[in-house]
Amino acid sequence: MSVEVANETEWQLDPKVFSELGLWVMHQMRVSTQSELTITFVDPEPIAELHERWMDLQGPTDVMSFPMDELRPGDERNEPEGMLGDIVICPWVAQQQAQAAGHSTMEEMMLLTIHGVLHLLGYDHHTREQERQMFGLQRQLLLTFFALHHGTAWSATLPSGSVNELEVYERKYGTNRELGH
């Protein structure tokens, strides 16, 4: 398994944390050791363009997933091989959601990483039952990962004097956007 992490923002975050999280979730979901995943952190404008192009929804969103080989979770006998796909995360939207939820931006981005992997594996939340199953699983995975790394301090910060790219986007295009995944 391999996880490549790219940070195209000013946010200072440790790519190793997201690589380790991605690998761990893939292992928990029994994805083949030959599978690959890419996680990219972007500013509001690039994710808004992807959001409109692929979902026909305006404005930036928190996370988008782009499956490649349409893998599904494996079992003891079968671990499907292939390119899992790409996850794109906007730290600016994650920050806003984290503030509303009362936890850190880093925790929100880790949750979004798990959410993205589950989408790549075919999970969705169109119905209440799907939402209950997917959100329950992502919470269980996140809490287990935290428990395994008890005492580890993770952070995602901005350099002093950084411009709030979400505010820049909203001034430029307005605030009419649909948050969510």
From Swiss-Prot:
Single GO term (MF): RNA endonuclease activity
Cofactor descriptive note: Binds 1 zinc ion.
Cofactor(s) the protein needs: Zn(2+)
SUPFAM superfamilies tied to this protein: Metalloproteases ('zincins'), catalytic domain (SSF55486)
Organism superkingdom: Bacteria
Gene Ontology terms describing biological process: rRNA processing
GO cellular component labels: cytoplasm
Binding positions (Zn(2+)): 115, 119, 125
Key words of the record: Cytoplasm, Endonuclease, Hydrolase, Metal-binding, Nuclease, Ribosome biogenesis, rRNA processing, Zinc
Main localization of the protein described in the UniProt heading: cytoplasm
Record localization: Cytoplasm
EC nos: 3.1.-.-
Main function: Single strand-specific metallo-endoribonuclease involved in late-stage 70S ribosome quality control and in maturation of the 3' terminus of the 16S rRNA.
NCBIfam families: rRNA maturation RNase YbeY (TIGR00043)
Record-stated family: Belongs to the endoribonuclease YbeY family.
Protein name per UniProt: Endoribonuclease YbeY
Gene: ybeY
